[in-house]
């Protein structure tokens, strides 16, 4: 697949270099999975570190609209700015206040399998490019203003990234497509989603993803739940490649055991309101997010 042109750089707008201390949390990271703008707002307000934003979560998620993404960036930025304002004039010296909110956008053109044809691959690449362009356009609205004029070196309010996944017919990573998606992200963090759990050989797939520049791997250890796949997750963590994010029926009550049994430093979970049907919007339960945040903050980081 040949592409013309180059991707706009997110690095200079959402990731400052060298990476300062606030980029490395001293606690287990909690990432929520949400379907709407309010879910992003709730996650940021309740203290989650990141949110993955996708549409149609009952179908395992698809790419949200560009309008939804823009509004979600603003919603997250507003919550971060409120937190920083509450921390006072020297918020930049306080890690919890300074930390940007991570927003990860799901790139998936349809439900069903993770094997994509050339047209679907082009659509995914175009989505990443368009979202990257949007991030550039919005950068001035989501980055703190420098005092006295000039370019600011303060951390941005929102750390934007992408969640992707593509396989071949034989159950291996579609290296060509994933490489193009990572290249188009051009420095923004890229997560490989739970298509990973459908790979025929997770160890081989994990090595492939490291070579492709993927920073995070979302996985249940190729099991129905993260708890059931704990041994596989632990093995991946021990191998020291991309950051492993444990996912799959993760609940607040099981977070301590999951972290202790796997050594993961990052977890991913949905926090839906009770009683929702598949035909209803998958709203986020703020109380559940807060409970999960309190739990992970109390869990000692694995050695």
Identify the residue ranges that each predicted region occupies.
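C-terminal alpha-helical cap/extension of soluble enzyme domains
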Residues: 2, 10, 108-112, 150-153, ...
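Hydrophobic faces of well-ordered beta-strands that scaffold small-molecule active sites
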Residues: 28-32, 51-53, 101-107, 162-164, ...
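Catalytic cores of alpha/beta
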Residues: 35-45, 113-133, 200-212, 236-240, ...
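Active-site-adjacent beta->alpha loops and helix N-cap segments on the catalytic face
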Residues: 37-38, 57-79, 119, 168-184, ...
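A structural motif
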Residues: 48, 135-136, 156-159, 187, ...
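Alpha-helix-loop-beta-strand connector modules within alpha/beta enzyme cores
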Residues: 63-111, 175-192, 231-252, 286-301
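Glycine/small-residue-rich loop that forms an oxyanion/phosphate-binding "nest" at active or ligand-binding sites
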Residues: 65-83, 91-175
């Amino acid at each position: 697949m040949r592409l013309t042109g180059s991707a706009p750089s997110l690095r200079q707008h959402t990731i400052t270099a060298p990476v300062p201390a606030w980029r490395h949390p001293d606690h287990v990271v909690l990432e929520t999975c949400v379907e709407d703008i309010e879910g992003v707002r709730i996650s940021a307000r309740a203290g989650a570190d990141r949110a993955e934003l996708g549409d149609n979560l009952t179908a395992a998620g698809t790419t949200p609209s560009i309008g939804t993404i823009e509004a979600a960036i603003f919603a997250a930025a507003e919550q971060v700015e409120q937190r920083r304002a509450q921390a006072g004039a020297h918020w930049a010296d306080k890690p919890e206040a300074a930390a940007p909110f991570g927003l990860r956008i799901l790139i998936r053109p349809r439900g069903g399998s993770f094997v994509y044809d050339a047209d679907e691959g082009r659509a995914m690449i175009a989505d990443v490019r368009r979202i990257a362009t949007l991030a550039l356009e919005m950068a001035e609205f989501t980055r703190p203003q420098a005092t006295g004029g000039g370019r600011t070196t303060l951390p941005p309010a929102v750390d934007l990234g992408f969640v992707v996944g593509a396989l071949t017919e034989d159950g291996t990573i579609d290296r060509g497509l994933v490489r193009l998606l990572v290249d188009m992200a051009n420095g923004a963090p890229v997560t490989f989603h739970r298509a990973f759990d459908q790979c025929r050989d997770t160890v081989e797939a994990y090595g492939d993803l490291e070579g492709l520049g993927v920073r995070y791997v979302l996985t249940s250890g190729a099991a129905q739940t993260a708890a059931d796949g704990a041994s596989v997750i632990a093995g991946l963590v021990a191998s020291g490649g991309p950051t492993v994010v444990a996912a799959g029926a993760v609940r607040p009550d099981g977070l301590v055991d999951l972290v202790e049994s796997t050594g993961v430093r990052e977890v991913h979970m949905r926090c839906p309101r009770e009683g929702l049907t598949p035909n209803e919007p998958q709203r986020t339960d703020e109380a559940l997010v807060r409970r999960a945040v309190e739990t992970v903050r109390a869990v000692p980081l694995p050695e």
